[in-house]
């Protein structure tokens, strides 16, 4: 009876379920360890991690609901999800809530969330539907490329204004989906050339028109005082659109400089956390210091989010960090195996798009933690402490499990036919 009940709940590919639960286990351990600053502010050792566990439980419930949705309903929901994404992105651009200098959140029904998280899934959903609808024996029709660009046009710029790294991540995932969908190489080559030129132009504009926000801040000014001062400033519409240039320029300069920073110039919310993340990695070893024994978590303001992989390396060592990375690789290859068994193109493209989205974001986070790329602000999926992003990522896994169920049913039908 118990086995039957569990079987009805944990449907779909068992390997993906195992990967998900291992990631959640690592998340609970590391968020509890890395949330020392939050526990101090909350005056409770357990409050931050209990809130995180509650979000994971809600995410699992949403995941179970999603995996019971048949693939054809995802296809039917595409225009509505796209419309919702565009409306909420416009909403956040006009009247969104600002945190740490970035206007990325809106409040809906008492819940604060980032519309860009929904927009990522909406773009993957739309791209999968376009690629599947316009597939031919030789690959995707030329019209597929144009339709995908038409869908990207209203969404990517709205995301890019406040979250450049998310826009870049989304574009990379869509490009990989078009590769999988066999979009003509000539079109992809032209797109790649345009993107390279656009990125070069953007970097030039950022370096030319962005200001060094660190140099302009008064000495010894706290983050709270900076935030209050920012709120008092009256910014024009143009300044509100391009205000992130300063942040992008600062991050590029810091990444390229690689020079020692004088103690009086250290910003505990920016410079120090990168330095201490590097110290956390450098002082680790093969086995690590053990869960809960991090020495650098108190000096990294985003130890539970953007830089949690550095804390994982410090506490779990090279072996633990490699194990976590392998979980994402297993998720990607397992989803690829599921996609290869799908009878129709849409669920295959949809599942692979979601897997690429999650794994590419994880790769971004890991590269930031070890200093390979500038700080992006991308959390580590399923491990970093998050809000609605955690729940939405669980929905993405639920959608992959839904595809695995349909592929499994196909295999069972084929097996029954062969037996007959």
Segments (PLM) and residue ranges:
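N-terminal membrane topogenic signal
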Residues: 1-20
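Helix-boundary and loop/linker segments of multi-pass membrane transporters
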Residues: 8-10, 143-144, 297-300, 343
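Residues that form generic nucleotide/phosphate-binding pockets
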Residues: 8-9, 255, 280
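Transmembrane alpha-helices of multi-pass inner-membrane enzymes
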Residues: 19, 25, 373-409
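Hydrophobic alpha-helical transmembrane segments of multi-pass inner membrane proteins, especially
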Residues: 21-33, 43-269, 310-371, 395-399, ...
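Transmembrane helix boundary and interhelical junction motifs in multipass membrane proteins
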Residues: 163-168, 289-292, 304-305, 373-376, ...
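Long extracytoplasmic/lumenal interhelical loops at the membrane interface
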Residues: 265-319, 346
């Amino acid at each position: 009876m118990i086995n039957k009940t569990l079987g009805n709940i944990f449907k779909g590919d068992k390997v993906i379920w195992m990967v998900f639960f291992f990631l959640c286990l690592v998340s609970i351990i590391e968020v509890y360890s890395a949330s020392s600053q939050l526990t101090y502010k909350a005056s409770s050792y357990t409050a931050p991690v209990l809130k995180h566990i509650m979000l994971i439980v809600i995410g699992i419930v949403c995941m179970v609901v999603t995996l019971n949705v048949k693939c054809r309903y995802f296809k039917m929901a595409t225009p509505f999800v796209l419309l919702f994404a565009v409306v909420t992105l416009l909403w956040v651009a006009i009247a969104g809530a600002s945190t740490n200098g970035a206007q990325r959140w809106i409040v809906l029904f008492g819940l604060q969330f980032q519309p860009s998280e929904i927009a990522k899934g909406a773009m993957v959903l739309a791209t999968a539907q376009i690629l599947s609808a316009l597939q031919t024996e030789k690959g995707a029709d030329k019209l597929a490329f144009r339709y995908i660009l038409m869908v990207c046009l209203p969404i990517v710029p709205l995301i890019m204004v406040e979250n450049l790294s998310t826009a870049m991540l989304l574009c990379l995932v869509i490009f990989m989906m078009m590769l999988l969908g066999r979009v003509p190489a000539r079109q992809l080559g032209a797109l790649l050339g345009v993107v390279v030129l656009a990125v070069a132009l953007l970097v030039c504009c950022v370096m030319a028109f962005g200001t060094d926000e660190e140099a302009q801040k008064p000495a010894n000014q706290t983050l709270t005082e900076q935030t209050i001062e920012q709120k008092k400033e009256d910014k024009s519409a143009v300044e509100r659109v391009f205000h992130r240039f300063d942040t992008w320029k600062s991050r590029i300069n810091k990444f390229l400089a690689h020079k020692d920073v004088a103690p009086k110039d250290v910003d505990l919310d920016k410079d120090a956390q990168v330095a201490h993340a590097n110290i956390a990695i450098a002082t680790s070893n093969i086995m690590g210091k053990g869960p809960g024994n991090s020495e650098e978590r108190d000096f990294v303001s985003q130890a539970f989010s953007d830089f949690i992989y550095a804390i994982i390396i410090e506490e779990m060592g090279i072996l633990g960090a490699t194990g976590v990375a392998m979980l994402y690789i297993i998720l990607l290859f397992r989803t690829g195996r599921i996609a290869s068994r799908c009878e129709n193109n849409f669920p295959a493209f949809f599942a692979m798009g979601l897997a690429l989205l999650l794994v590419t974001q994880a790769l971004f986070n890991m590269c930031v933690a070890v200093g390979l790329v500038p700080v992006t602000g991308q959390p580590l999926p399923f491990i970093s402490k998050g809000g609605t992003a955690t729940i939405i990522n669980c929905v993405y896994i639920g959608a992959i499990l839904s595809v695995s169920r349909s592929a499994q049913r196909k295999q069972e039908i084929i097996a029954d036919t062969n037996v007959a």
